[in-house]
Amino acid sequence: MIPLKMLLLVTLLLGASLQVTHAARGTNVGRECCLEYFKGAIPISRLTRWYKTSGECPKDAIVFVTVQGKSICSDPKDKRVKKAVRYLQRTWKGGPQES
């Protein structure tokens, strides 16, 4: 019976340490990360700016900000996303706009 108690204790401690590690990593990650990409049509005429998510984020993403201040997470490899970025670069004469 002692090995079962020891196994339970080790499992409990391991689970608790993983939760602490996960929370700490989340704190150090940038202000905003995208967990999934928007799959609909990108309203190009309603976009005001764009930026790339932090390299520390689990997924590379381009974030578009609309005139209403809403953020749209997008796949940087998607041709519609590339088209929207080119549009904003021509409109604003530059690269990613800082938030």
Curated annotation (Swiss-Prot):
Record's Gene Ontology CC terms? extracellular space
GO BP: immune response; inflammatory response
Q: List the disulfide bonds.
A: 33-57, 34-73
> Which positions carry the signal peptide feature in this UniProt record?
1-23
Which InterPro entries did the record assign?
Answer: Chemokine_b/g/d, Chemokine_CC_CS, Chemokine_IL8-like_dom, Interleukin_8-like_sf
Subcellular location(s) per record: Secreted
Output the superkingdom of the source species.
Eukaryota
**GO molecular-function terms, A-Z:** chemokine activity
Q: Name one Pfam family in it.
A: IL8
Check the record and name the CDD domains matching this protein. Chemokine_CC (cd00272)
User: Keywords, A to Z?
Assistant: Chemotaxis, Cytokine, Disulfide bond, Inflammatory response, Secreted, Signal
Q: In which tissues is it expressed?
A: Expressed in thymus, spleen, lymph node, lung and heart.
Zinc listed as a keyword:
no
Work out whether the entry's keyword set contains Signal: yes
- Family as reported in the entry's similarity comment: Belongs to the intercrine beta (chemokine CC) family.
Function (record text): Chemokine, which displays chemotactic activity for T lymphocytes, preferentially Th2 cells, but not monocytes or granulocytes. Therefore plays an important role in a wide range of inflammatory and immunological processes. Acts by binding to CCR4 at T-cell surface. Mediates GM-CSF/CSF2-driven pain and inflammation. In the brain, required to maintain the typical, highly branched morphology of hippocampal microglia under homeostatic conditions.
The protein's name in its UniProt record? C-C motif chemokine 17
Organism in which the protein naturally occurs = Canis lupus familiaris
Its organism's taxonomic lineage begins at:
Eukaryota, Metazoa, Chordata, Craniata, Vertebrata
